[in-house]
Amino acid sequence: MAIVRPVVRATMIVPGALRPAFFRAVPRRTRMSSLPASASRRHVHTRAIRVDAYARDDGLWDLEAALVDTKSRDFPLATGIRKAGEPVHEMRVTLTIDTQLNVVDARARSDATPYPGYCETIAADYRKLIGLNLRQDFRRHVREKLGGTLGCSHLTELTSVLPTAAIQAFAGEVFKTRDAAGDDHHRTQEKPWQLDRCHALRSDGPAVARYYPRWYRAQHKTHKSN
């Protein structure tokens, strides 16, 4: 078995009393305060999503994604009462990928579901993810293979966070992130992978002008003749 080491963790924090065990050890410095509430309110539901990435000693990478839904009150289901704080859904998807973001293995598991004995039977179908590439229409291909009644809506939704989680894991490990004078991009003709992938890092923007001056492209204004 390949040895793995954790590389990156992306976590949504949930309230302490309802926090599933695998969310409780998140360092305090990673916690985000809520935006100001516009009216008085009561907490009803928490959906927590966590992704861990591991670099394996065989050169591959594991992405482990988990989704947990909990309620703040006892919740009646067709199959019985789910107590406050007990997961209504607790599901996991693990992809093994190479450095080209090709999926070489895929596994899914449902540990808590609203309909035990039924929901979890679809897990093996998530092996259909093998052969996909996280940067080549991954979400569309997942919908085609596992959307609607072809899969579990929650497992399928969970896969949607994996492309960007993989890119964050690869940053500084597989993808070079340095800039400024003397960086790797000055020694090669390779454009930094993160440019032109969001509004802040557009090639004609001030952030690129400051941090990636070599790749800055000023926007040329066109003048209409009268």
What are these regions (language model features)?
Residues 1-8, 12-14, 26:
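Short hydrophobic transmembrane-like helices used for membrane targeting/insertion
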Residues 6, 17-19, 37:
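Generic early N-terminus positional signal peaking at residue ~5-7
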Residues 8-10, 22, 137:
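Residues at secondary-structure transition points
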Residues 14-30:
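Serine-biased, low-complexity intrinsically disordered segments, primarily in secretory-pathway proteins
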Residues 29-32, 56-57, 98-100:
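Secondary-structure boundary elements
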Residues 36-63, 68-80:
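N-terminal intrinsically disordered, cationic/polar leader segments
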